[in-house]
Each structure stands twice: as structure tokens, then as C-alpha cells.
Amino acid sequence: MPEPQDAPSLRLTLAPDRHAVSRGETISVAVALTGARDVTSVPFHLQFDPGVLQYVGTRTGPALNGRSLQPIFLASVNPDRPGDLAVGLSFVRSSGTFNGSGAILLIDFLALGRGRSDLHFDRATVRGATSEPLTAEVVGSTAEVR
């Protein structure tokens, strides 16, 4: 029987590098894991206001730099749902699993129009060594364009 997960310690968080930006500036939103053990994938949707922010691109975060892990990720916005960014991040099985804490992805947005955009996860899961969903606290954020 597997050991029970330490549920409260695992957290998936959205953390913008700044909470307020001017129109035309880029804001980077870190997707961070805290207290991860044997994580193999992190699929999620990120909801945002497309009138305030425009998705620009996604890159691996500093928590993955200097590790032997081989991340594979896809990120795209469906033109029919402009405020819905679908992201899939997984690690090549032979390269190991993610353990620890830190920003695993950085998602860049262009500040388009004045206003406030909630940034929240939808259908987010953190998956363990056998692709089982792990119990995790999921925390969103906001961004303001002035």
C-alpha cells in the first residue's frame, strides 16, 4: 500500500513578477510548485481576461535549470476561447521526476488594455510517479494593467 501523500504541503501557484504593469509591457507569470515529490506531469488551463492580457509565450522556469530532467511542454490558446491557455508539462520518464520547490514554467503576457485580470487555474492536476493525481492546493493570482 502506498504511503499517504502529505496533502497540505504540495502547492501549485501562479505568481506574476509584478502585480501592476502599464499597457505595452510584458508580465511574466511563474507557475510554481512547492513541496513536490516524484512529480511527472502538471497539466492545466490558465484562465485570463483577453481584453487585458495577450498570451505571448511559455518557457521553462528556473527550478528546472541545471537538473537532468527533460521537460516537454505545450502551451496554446484556442482562437475560439481567447482567455483559456491550455498547458501540458511532463518529464521524460527516463530523466526522473521533479522534487522540491520553485518556478517550473514562466508564462509571458503582453499588457493590452487597462483593467484587472484574474489569473486562475482550471482543470489543474499535479501527477505523481504512476500518473496518479496528487492532492495539491491550487492558488491563482491577479494582474492589473494601468
Where are these regions (language model features)?
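Acidic, low-complexity intrinsically disordered segments
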Residues: M1-R146
